[in-house]
Regions:
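Glycine-rich phosphate/pyrophosphate-binding beta-alpha loops
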Residues: 150, 154, 205-219
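ATP/NTP phosphate-donor binding region
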Residues: 1-65, 76
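ATP/nucleoside-binding phosphotransfer catalytic cores, i.e., glycine-rich phosphate-binding loops
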Residues: 192-193, 198, 223, 233-304
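Gly/Ser/Thr-rich active-site loops/lids in small-molecule metabolic enzymes
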Residues: 165-171, 214, 220-241
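Short glycine/serine/threonine-rich phosphate/pyrophosphate-binding segments
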Residues: 47, 70-74, 101, 127
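A generic structural signal for short beta-strands and their flanking turns/coil linkers
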Residues: 184-186, 200-202, 225-229, 264-266
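Catalytic core of DAGKc-family lipid kinases
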Residues: 80-202
Length: 304
């Protein structure tokens, strides 16, 4: 039986502004004769449980109303559920987050009406899904990322970002300017299929999509559907290097710096030389430990 679409909305997305759009979204979905059931998250991470329950109820199509964090958790829920092949589940997006990085990467309109029209048209594409296995002292965790995951400065900033959230899309910029003086490079061993190196890292991450962190372009020319991770490594940065390159993170010209390396691999391992290595993904702290990254090729079926 066709259950239609399960619409999952995060009312706290964009500092609560998404909640005000609910009635408009429902009206537009009805006007397009899109059959749907409505689910609202009440706490962080509830998207995963909602997806698991909805799949058990027969839903095979989901609409995410929110930002990158909401999308990431819905897709994680699709992977975790045991009822059907995750590739057979379709996800559409009405992007109402602060950054909407994934929506930009897959060229989903940021306008609500146009995004809903895309869902109505029903055209789909396949996209890669990133995975990181975090081997900590007491447990091993597996987390999924739709855009970018890494270590270094951006993970350092995420721990301090909460008090800047009220600034919306400028939160990361303000947090970075206020706190970059306190960051110290971390020496990391990094291994891929055809490379092995040890560097003092300012920023090191892997991605399957172009944008992250509210528009930063840290990943160079990701295909997003070839089963490969694109790694970017900024090493031996001084405070002057950070200042010089800060805005280059947003326009893509950071790759012109000789201290920035890029490489492609299907599997990448990162191990700290000393201490603990904190990993983040899609704007969320995932955990600390030794890291192994890989890709589930064309694992996501999304509206385009």
């Amino acid at each position: 039986m066709n259950k239609g679409w399960a619409v999952i909305i995060n009312p706290q997305s964009r500092a609560g502004a998404t909640k005000k759009k609910t009635s408009i979204i429902k009206r537009l979905l009805n006007s397009e004769k899109i059959h749907f059931s409505y689910y609202k998250t009440r706490r962080a991470g509830e998207e995963i449980n909602i997806v698991e329950r909805a799949v058990e109820e027969g839903f095979r199509k989901f609409i995410c109303v929110g930002g990158d964090g909401t999308i990431q958790k819905i897709i994680a829920g699709i992977q975790i559920q045991k009822v059907c092949d995750p590739k057979k589940i379709v996800i559409g997006i009405i992007p109402l987050g602060t950054g909407n990085d994934w929506a930009k990467s897959i060229k989903v309109p940021l306008n609500i009406k146009r995004a809903i029209r895309k869902i109505k048209e029903g055209k789909t594409k396949k996209r890669d899904l990133g995975v990181v296995v975090i081997k900590g002292k007491r447990e091993i965790k597996k987390r999924y990322f739709i855009s970018y995951s890494g270590v270094g400065f951006d993970a350092f900033m995420l721990k301090r970002l909460q008090k800047y959230k009220w600034l919306g899309k400028y939160a990361y910029l303000a947090c970075s300017i206020a706190n970059f003086w306190f960051y110290k490079n971390t020496r990391i061993s990094i291994k891929g299929e055809k490379f092995s190196l040890s560097k003092s890292v300012f920023l090191c991450g892997v991605g399957v999509s172009k944008y992250t962190g509210g528009g930063m372009q840290i990943i160079k020319n990701p295909a997003g559907n070839n089963g490969l991770l694109n790694l970017t490594l900024a090493h031996d940065f001084t405070k002057i290097d950070i200042i010089k390159n800060f805005f280059n993170l947003f326009n893509g010209s950071i790759f012109n710096d000789p201290k920035v390396l890029t490489v492609v691999s299907s599997k990448i391992k990162m191990v700290p030389k000393t201490g603990s290595l904190t990993c983040h993904g899609d704007g969320e702290i995932f955990g600390s430990g030794n890291l192994t990254f890989f890709v589930l090729k064309k694992q996501i079926t999304h509206i385009c």
